[in-house]
């Protein structure tokens, strides 16, 4: 089961609504669902909450180290409570996924994401779960730094919030250790709305009788 849920972002009001803080938004939603409150914990360099799920302690963490040093916070809590990498899930913004979509995976590269890069280094392993929350790509690599530190458009914000709400429905499966089910739930999007029935074709007039012409 997942014992440590981490959301990545940058601390402070200047960053609250930026794309890079999508991971924080996800943890905020999970905290609401579990009815716990995040509080500052200096020992773990972040905002922390503890939930009890079926007699098991589960931790929620928002590192307050700024993105590039996220691993310092994650490793501090994980090592103290002897949580293994495969028992950790990190929710983060993902450039290569469109707004409105999210993907769940275990392991793999950090793909240039500086928060993941530091978690890799501090844990000494890439073998943790990632919930990749789509924020879209600006289309030009040189614009990425500005893109992630800006607020999404209202339409994109709604799409991101929708994907967060949808992926949070997989949290019970994550807590139960059924990651196959969790993956299926995250990756299964809402079915398209059925198309309205086509109007019935207008009746074809019968040909006039010879005597009627």
Curated annotation (Swiss-Prot):
Coiled-coil spans in chain: none
Gene Ontology cellular component terms for the protein in this record: cytoplasm
The entry's keywords: Cytoplasm, Hydrolase, RNA-binding, tRNA-binding
Residues bound to tRNA: 15, 66, 68, 114
Biased composition annotated in UniProt, kind: Low complexity: 201-213
A GO MF term: peptidyl-tRNA hydrolase activity
Job description of the protein: Hydrolyzes ribosome-free peptidyl-tRNAs (with 1 or more amino acids incorporated), which drop off the ribosome during protein synthesis, or as a result of ribosome stalling. Catalyzes the release of premature peptidyl moieties from peptidyl-tRNA molecules trapped in stalled 50S ribosomal subunits, and thus maintains levels of free tRNAs and 50S ribosomes.
The protein's name in its UniProt record: Peptidyl-tRNA hydrolase
């Amino acid at each position: 089961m997942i014992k440590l849920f981490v959301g990545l972002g940058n601390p402070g009001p200047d960053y609250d609504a930026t794309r890079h803080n999508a991971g924080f938004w996800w943890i905020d939603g999970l905290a609401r669902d579990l009815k716990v409150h995040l509080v500052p914990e200096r020992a773990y360099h972040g905002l922390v909450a503890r939930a009890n799920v079926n007699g098991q302690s589960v931790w929620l963490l928002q590192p307050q180290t700024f993105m590039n040093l996220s691993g310092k916070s994650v490793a501090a809590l994980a090592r103290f409570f002897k949580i293994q990498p495969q028992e950790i899930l990190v929710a983060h913004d993902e450039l290569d996924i469109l707004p409105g979509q999210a993907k769940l995976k275990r392991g793999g590269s950090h793909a240039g994401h500086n928060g993941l890069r530091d978690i890799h280094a501090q844990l000494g392993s890439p073998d943790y779960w990632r919930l990749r929350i789509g924020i879209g790509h600006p289309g030009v690599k040189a614009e990425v730094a500005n893109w992630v530190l800006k607020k999404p458009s209202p339409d994109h914000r709604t799409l991101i919030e929708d994907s967060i709400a949808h992926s949070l429905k997989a949290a019970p499966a994550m807590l139960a250790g059924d990651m196959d089910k969790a993956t299926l739930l995250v990756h299964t999007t809402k079915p398209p709305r059925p198309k309205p029935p086509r109007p019935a074709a207008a009746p074809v007039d019968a040909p006039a009788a010879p005597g009627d012409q």
